[in-house]
Amino acid sequence: QYRSLSDGDGSWYSMRGNVDYQRTSKKNKDRMITLSYKISTQPQNSDYYTDYKDIKDPFEMDIVKKFLLNNSHSDGKTNTTEHTFQVDYTTPIGKLHTIEAGAKYIIRNNLSDNKLFEAEGVSDNYEYNNDRSSKYKHLNDILAAYLGYTLRYKTFSFKPGVRYEYTSQDVKYLAGAIGPEADFSTSYNDFVPSVTMGIKIGKTQNLRGGY
């Protein structure tokens, strides 16, 4: 028989910001370039204590060790920071053709640092428990680019395009039960072609198909 008391506090907030710049050609208003930058961050902190009180062991089972009734203190910090860079360009070619191109680069960093301190039984002499603690970084780099072409002739439109994506992941263990020997990196990429065709069959009706 025992009582457990938990007490702690935590904090969390989010910050976001962005800057955009767009330039349009003086000779052709349909020709433009757009530059964008975004940033976001979400830090979190937690600090908790768990204490065990009024422990009764009438059967001498040594329940403190058997059920791990050790006073503990956990200190956790996590944060995700993301930077996004993007460029988009559109230009008409003659009266029937339009070319679109763009790229996006995302840097996403995740950091987690969780420390656990345990006391011997119900004392307040806390010691760092490496086996129940962890600290690691998860780094992501994502690159995407696209190229599209549009043909518009009277009521008919034809739009083929292709999109490329590349992702790189890097995980590093900095402290705790899992050490640097478990670090790993991986990457992969994809090509995604697409095509869309459409025809206007009335003032308010359009027929469209895509792949």
Regions found by a protein language model. Give the residues of each.
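Primarily recognizes Gram-negative and organellar outer-membrane beta-barrels
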Residues: 1-211
